[in-house]
């Protein structure tokens, strides 16, 4: 959706009035359900994280990093509703298919660098909001280390706050192969999806039954590209009412068979102490959940699109999509801030053991506090989703630089989530190479995060 810089008195308009104006400019052919599902999926993940993370103070007065799914096994069923990253990848397939097809239509015959420019622009819009949170936590990790804090605690706080960046590394790789995956869909249709399902099943077979090490990481592509492929089917009009209901039924049956009667855990995210995780790396069970959720949300699509004809609801959707990556990237920072303040205040609210009646009744209060802590972060950092610097002054970025750049970004983000930017040794207490990789990747791809942040006039945003 297009948005431009507010000038003069327009700069003083409320965010709601700006979103309302943008919502009224949306073309009538736009599928508003896509935007709604994008916002819904991220918000579900945010509230799921706030609910699952359950630190408390034990009888000895020590803070324990409680995990609700480990404390209350029945709560693992809740992840079937809160683990909605598959919906984000479904929406990503729809959006990337539309965007890439439009870019091809606009390209002149024989024009070079079409893919490189398209992909560099997509990367820039996704990675720019990461830079502020990454820099802040690098500075905090350094400051906490210099203050003499236990390095394990520094690592725990830093890793908890930054773990959401894992999905960006995967999503960038999935987006990178959009031209290939879309071409496969156009040529083979549903067979292109079935091939990925069989590939995910084969990886799980090698992992669980043959004990082949490391091969399970291939499912980051098989599973997520498979769900991304369903987005093409949706955009192509191949998932109508009957097909959507069939996907819902088949996906749910497979999910129950794999988890209730099969070897896979009920939880769709990692549970402390569990031998198998459905998300890191993903399994065929998570793919079954993705098919189930696809069938559900597309069965509801006609009702949802009619509902979004309501201007207030559509404006709220536009407003949320304008800050959605900021909400996602900063929500655990807000959580850590609240926990630290509660601890400094004598452990107020942390004396309740997770899962008790008292703990459940106080969840709405805690979530309200998390939202209040998040609001200033949105106010300061959401602009990173709306301002973009030029990519090499409009010149095409060389192919090798694009490849090296995206690899550096993805490796940096993956390491941030996997091993943390906090270092157990060294003078600074920070893994500087991990922090630097996304910035190096951005520079290689031709856009500078510092320039972007201080740029006053927002460029056109998708």
Question: Where are each of the predicted segments found?
Answer:
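Alpha-helical transmembrane segments and their immediate juxtamembrane cytosolic regions
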Residues: 2, 7-462
